[in-house]
């Protein structure tokens, strides 16, 4: 992502969006926008706009954050070892904007690969199916057909 475009987008973020995506913060569980979203659509990086996750792969993990079994395109997420807070975890960042998204854990549904991408709502923007074309994401409509 072009640095000037990224800086412009960063200035438009709310405090929580900035803290989560740029400082690897974490929003509160069960008190965020998408933890219980059941609408069909895709989730894009709040900074770059790149598609990251589909509601088809979202499930209720009971953790209080949106959880997914996989990204739309694995090339759009990068994983890093995270040793903060006295834990060993795998951080998930967006490939294009280097936004902190959340973490991935090996305790997801076994029949869907066994992974749980636990993602902060503040790192995402949701595009409902009926707005995909209008928002420039028409190529992703096929996911829901």
From Swiss-Prot:
GO molecular function annotation: peptide-methionine (R)-S-oxide reductase activity
Transmembrane feature ranges: none
Statement: the UniProt record of this protein carries the keyword Cell membrane: no
GO CC aspect terms: cytoplasm
Keyword annotations of the record: Oxidoreductase
Recorded catalytic activity of this chain's protein: L-methionyl-[protein] + [thioredoxin]-disulfide + H2O = L-methionyl-(R)-S-oxide-[protein] + [thioredoxin]-dithiol
UniProt keyword NAD present: no
EC number(s) reported in the record: 1.8.4.12
Organism superkingdom: Bacteria
Record-annotated active site: 118 (nucleophile)
InterPro entries found in the cross-reference section: Met_Sox_Rdtase_MsrB, Met_Sox_Rdtase_MsrB_dom, Mss4-like_sf
Pfam families: SelR (PF01641)
Family per similarity comment: Belongs to the MsrB Met sulfoxide reductase family.
Protein's recorded name: Peptide methionine sulfoxide reductase MsrB
Organism expressing this protein natively: Listeria monocytogenes serotype 4a (strain HCC23)
Lineage of source species: Bacteria, Bacillati, Bacillota, Bacilli, Bacillales
